[in-house]
């Protein structure tokens, strides 16, 4: 059996194909706003944005659990022993 590597596609006349008309605009475009609504830009005051305005509270509970926990080391050794036929 012989299979052709090229897939046969029907030939289309490009003169008969027309582009779709774009949807009509409901309003005339007056300007482009970047960064949100115009209500936010009209506020007065000293707002700090970016890295300087970012406040992050540190959670020490994760660091304490890692420092005080030798449970993972014990767990690994028990798994290793059980894999080689030893007791837990």
From Swiss-Prot:
Keyword Zinc-finger in the entry? The reply is no
Q: Where is the composition biased (Basic and acidic residues)?
A: 54-63
Coiled coil regions, renumbered to chain: none
Q: Does the keyword Calcium apply?
A: no
Q: What does this protein do?
A: Plays a role in virion morphogenesis, and is ejected from the infecting particle into the bacterial cell.
> Where is the protein situated, by its record's location annotation?
Virion
The record's section on InterPro entries has: Phage_T7-like_6.7
- Show the segment(s) annotated as Disordered: 1-88
Using the record, list the residue span of the signal peptide; answer none if the entry has no such feature.
none
Q: Say which species the protein is native to.
A: Escherichia phage T7
Sorted alphabetically, which keywords does the UniProt record give? Virion
Q: What's the short name of a Pfam family annotated to this entry?
A: T7-like_gp67
Q: Name one GO cellular component term.
A: T=7 icosahedral viral capsid
User: What name has this protein been given in UniProt?
Assistant: Protein 6.7
Main location as per UniProt: virion
- Per the UniProt entry, the disulfide pairs are none
């Amino acid at each position: 059996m012989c299979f052709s590597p090229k897939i046969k596609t029907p030939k289309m006349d490009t003169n008969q194909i027309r582009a779709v008309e774009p949807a009509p605009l409901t309003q005339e475009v007056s300007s482009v706003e970047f960064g949100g609504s115009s209500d936010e830009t009209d506020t007065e005051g000293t707002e700090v944005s970016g890295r300087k305005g970012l406040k992050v509270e540190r959670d020490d509970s994760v660091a304490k659990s890692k420092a005080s926990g030798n449970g993972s080391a014990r767990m690994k050794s028990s798994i290793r022993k059980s894999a080689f036929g030893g007791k837990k």
